[in-house]
């Protein structure tokens, strides 16, 4: 009987300790945010280990018109990711899924070198001035400039 009681108490203590550690873990702010901001997209891209994060954040701003476009609001699609097979823009449950999809659908092709040249090479955007606009946004947007450091 003493062994059973000891075992029950020990298991209860271990379970309580485990549960308290789970409660202590903080969920990163970007994971629970309903609407994207440059700072949250930056954190999310860093979490998913995207490369050239500053450019990726600039793309999200440019593609969504500062997160105000229909594709952003209704599809949670921050990058204008398009399914050429079904001829539709991808829909995501959350904007965070869009960031993760960017890595899977765009960056998996990237090996090294000039990222702007890579985007041009894969015909990322139809706009012939896209890279110029992206570079300008990367340096001129005051809201975004805090992310450069």
Where are the regions a protein language model picked out?
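Sec-dependent N-terminal signal peptides
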Residues: 4-13
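Catalytic cores of secreted/periplasmic lytic hydrolases that degrade extracellular macromolecules
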Residues: 18-149
């Amino acid at each position: 009987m003493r062994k059973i009681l000891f075992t029950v108490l020990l298991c209860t203590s271990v379970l309580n300790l485990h549960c308290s550690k789970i409660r202590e873990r903080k969920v990163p702010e970007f994971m629970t945010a309903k609407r994207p901001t440059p700072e949250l997209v930056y954190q999310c891209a860093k979490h998913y280990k995207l490369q050239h994060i500053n450019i990726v954040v600039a793309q999200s701003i440019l593609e969504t018109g500062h997160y105000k476009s229909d594709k952003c609001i209704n599809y949670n699609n921050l990058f204008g990711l398009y399914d050429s097979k079904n001829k539709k823009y991808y829909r995501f449950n959350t904007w965070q899924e869009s960031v993760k999809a960017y890595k899977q659908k765009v960056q998996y092709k990237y090996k090294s070198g000039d990222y702007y040249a890579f985007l041009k090479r894969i015909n990322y955007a139809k706009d012939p001035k896209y890279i110029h606009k992206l570079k300008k946004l990367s340096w001129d947007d005051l809201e975004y400039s805090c992310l450069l450091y």
